[in-house]
Amino acid sequence: MLHSQLRKIEFKEEWNMGSILSGPLEEELERHNREMQRARNYIRSKRKKTEFELCVIGSYQMFYDQALEAVQGIRELWPGADELPSEGTGPYNTGKCLKLGPYQEDQDALEAAEVQPPVKKDRKPLYLCHGDLDQHHVLMGGSYTAIIEYNRMHLGIQISDLYRFMRKVMEKHGWNLDLGLSMLDSYERVLPMEPKERGCLYYLFLYPEKYWKQLNFYYNANKAWIPARNTDKLRGLEEQQQARNSFLKRLKADCKGCV
């Protein structure tokens, strides 16, 4: 329901002056790729390596290949899409700017619609996103559910919210396939995904975000002392690969030719 409600909010020109606009998703992931390379290159330059560093060397290529494929895949979903918004409407990419709102030719028929229609297949579907959605931001009441902390709200692809929420849950439950499919089904009963949105979700799950986080934390922290739990986290990622790959395989099969 959160995303359905956010899709009703029209873009305002004054947002251009704030942090509600963010760069393309693929550019953020490309930056993460460079950070992984930087950490790996540093580790390779060391003559004596710690247990954590040996784990990185042993698993790096597998995860980095996933990262490259994910970035390229997201970029190819909406090639050349511009993310500059115009005031007053919902996602509509003209090629020069993005207008948020229904298409002009359908305006009369859609004026009474509660939720704006999905954008055309070659347009990037940009709407307001929570930006940091996980289980800690969901409050369950006796007769209501509330979402809190919107300090990272931005204009972007709403599927990224779904990914963040699901990834945390899936990691905690060993990438349980039935659980993942149940969450996807619950989401789509309220807001069905377009094929390219499902493809984007697949590539976001393919991207090794937790692996990147471990390498980036290592590179920016005190490398003389690495907590044992960091090494355990890397090993845990490797141990979960089989279950994670099964979930990715099923997700990819449902992408209807978009990946």
Where do the PLM segments sit?
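Active-site activation/catalytic loop segments of kinase-like enzymes and analogous catalytic loops
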Residues: I159-P192, F205-A224
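Helix N-cap / loop-to-helix initiation motif
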Residues: M193-E197
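Catalytic activation segment of kinase domains across protein kinase-like and atypical kinase folds
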Residues: H136-L162
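ATP-dependent phospho-/nucleotidyl transfer catalytic cores
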Residues: E14-G90, C97-L128, S182
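Conserved catalytic-loop position in the HRD/HxD motif
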Residues: D132
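ATP/Mg2+ or Mg2+-diphosphate-binding catalytic cores
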Residues: W212-V259
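Conserved kinase catalytic-core helix
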Residues: M1-M17
